[in-house]
């Protein structure tokens, strides 16, 4: 059985993160993106955004480090919500999280900062690092 990540809207993701103690947000963009457009600000719900620089090289070493990060940072029953610019990298990150045993993985398909009006940056708190 192949389990696919659950697609979730940005506003629903924020609501979910605020209500579920075992939920975590993982931003899979690059450090350049984080610095230029900001990151999701979860301080109002007493949480921090987890940052994973996704790429530019996605080789075996990267995926081993990614797996180790997930296993050392979260419980496998936790709810992991992944976000990137437009929903593509976060989908891949969530698919691999499921492969590594984190079946409660979500993809914020509207992304952080894409062309549609429903993205995180337009509707939800942002902070700059």
Q: How should each PLM-predicted stretch be described?
A:
Residues 82-83:
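Short, surface-exposed ligand- or partner-binding patches at beta-edge/loop junctions that are enriched
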């Amino acid at each position: 059985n192949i389990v696919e990540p659950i697609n979730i809207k940005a506003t629903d993701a924020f609501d979910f993160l605020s209500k579920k103690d075992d939920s975590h947000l993982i931003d899979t963009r690059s450090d350049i993106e984080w610095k230029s457009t900001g990151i999701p600000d979860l301080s109002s719900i007493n949480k921090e955004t987890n940052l994973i620089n996704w790429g530019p090289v996605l080789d075996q070493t990267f995926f081993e480090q990614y797996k180790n990060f997930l296993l050392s940072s979260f419980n496998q029953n936790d709810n992991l919500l992944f976000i990137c610019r437009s929903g593509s990298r976060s989908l891949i990150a969530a698919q691999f999280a499921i492969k590594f045993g984190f079946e409660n993985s979500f993809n914020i398909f509207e992304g952080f900062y894409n062309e549609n009006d429903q993205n995180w940056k337009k509707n939800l708190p942002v902070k700059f690092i």
